[in-house]
């Protein structure tokens, strides 16, 4: 370009908008972040909830790499997971309440661990392992929540947690919501989402490059910018965040402080009967 060699992914705005195809239709996974509906919202095919906000899916849903269903993971996310899981400290969730076996109000806390996850014989995350909570407050988020019919939800708020790899330097949302199913074995699964700075995800994709990522980075850049639906810049008025949702699987684990004192108990044996079977409950109220 103008006799200079450069990586287009680093300066995508110098190239024209290719007007890539975008996902359309009735259904998409995600959460109703704003409590409203509208022409750009979806219906969750699993829960029946309407008003789903997931413009990230509108941008990515037509690319072959993302046109998959679980248990298959999108190629980019699969590579990132296999790279990070054995090198990046674990992300921790703690649920505290009067009686977690019944409906009621709870507190939900997210933290980053000091140590990395352990794998079980299936290659999944081992249940019943012990993690020391990183005392750095930047990866600590607290929410008021509720359990109803074994479904955990939270009141909206800000979420931030640090990663530690070239792919996931951090994950952050405003107006965060989640919907997790709490299972009898102590595990949880569901979705967390909110309004994510769209450039965070674009830069994550650009690290992979177009060849490995199997997407048109210039098209994704312009579509992220076009479909961003929150957090307008005070000067330009352009939205800087895009509605998104991420699938989460969590297994039971012990949380301790830097001195080894118990903070959160590991409740249940976990999925696939993997890891140490937890059959006793400590005095921790979790």
Regions from the PLM with identified roles:
Residues 1-286:
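Extracytosolic secretory-pathway proteins
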């Amino acid at each position: 370009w103008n006799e200079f060699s450069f990586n287009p992914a680093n300066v995508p705005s110098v190239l024209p908008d290719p007007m890539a195809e975008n996902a359309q239709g009735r259904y998409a996974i995600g959460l109703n972040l704003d409590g409203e509906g509208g022409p750009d919202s979806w219906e969750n095919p699993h829960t029946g909830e309407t008003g789903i906000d997931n413009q990230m899916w509108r941008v990515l849903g037509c690319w072959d790499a993302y046109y998959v269903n679980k248990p298959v993971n999108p190629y980019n996310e699969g590579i990132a997971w296999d790279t990070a899981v054995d090198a990046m400290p674990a992300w921790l969730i703690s649920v505290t309440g009067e009686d977690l076996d019944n409906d009621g109000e709870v507190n939900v806390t997210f933290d980053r661990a000091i140590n990395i996850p352990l794998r079980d014989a299936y290659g999944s995350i081992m249940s019943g392992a012990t993690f020391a909570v990183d005392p750095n407050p930047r990866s600590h988020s607290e929410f008021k929540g509720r359990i109803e019919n074994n479904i955990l939800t939270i009141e909206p708020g800000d979420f931030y947690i640090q990663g530690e790899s070239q792919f996931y330097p951090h994950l952050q949302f405003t107006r965060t919501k989640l919907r997790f199913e709490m299972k009898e074995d102590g595990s949880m699964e569901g979705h967390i989402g909110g309004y994510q700075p769209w450039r965070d995800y674009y830069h994550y994709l650009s690290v992979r490059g177009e060849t490995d990522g199997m997407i048109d980075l210039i098209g994704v850049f312009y579509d992220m910018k076009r479909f961003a639906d929150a957090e307008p810049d005070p000067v330009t008025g352009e939205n800087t965040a895009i509605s998104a949702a991420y699938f989460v699987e969590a297994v039971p684990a012990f949380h301790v402080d830097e001195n080894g004192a118990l903070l959160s108990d590991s409740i249940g044996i976990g999925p696939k009967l993997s890891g140490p079977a937890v059959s006793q409950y400590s005095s921790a109220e979790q």
